Curated annotation (Swiss-Prot):
The keyword Ribonucleoprotein applies. InterPro entries: Ribosomal_bL33, Ribosomal_bL33_sf, Ribosomal_zn-bd. Keywords: Ribonucleoprotein, Ribosomal protein. Transmembrane segments: none annotated. It comes from Chlorobium phaeobacteroides (strain DSM 266 / SMG 266 / 2430). GO terms for biological process: translation. This is Large ribosomal subunit protein bL33. Belongs to the bacterial ribosomal protein bL33 family. SUPFAM superfamilies: Zn-binding ribosomal proteins (SSF57829). GO terms for molecular function: structural constituent of ribosome.
Amino acid sequence: MAKGKENRIVITLECTEAKKEGKTVSRYTTTKNKKNTTERLLLKKYNPNLQRHTIHKEIK
């Protein structure tokens, strides 16, 4: 049995700039270690709908 697997959770990252512009949002799924990273993630990812890199924020 693997030890410590319960610390990793699957999260969804959603584009914040597309929401403001009223366009289709882009979403990414990834994992994070909730023990080491307790606050919500903010990452710069590519949004294919806007065709540029934008800030993606962790949602529930």
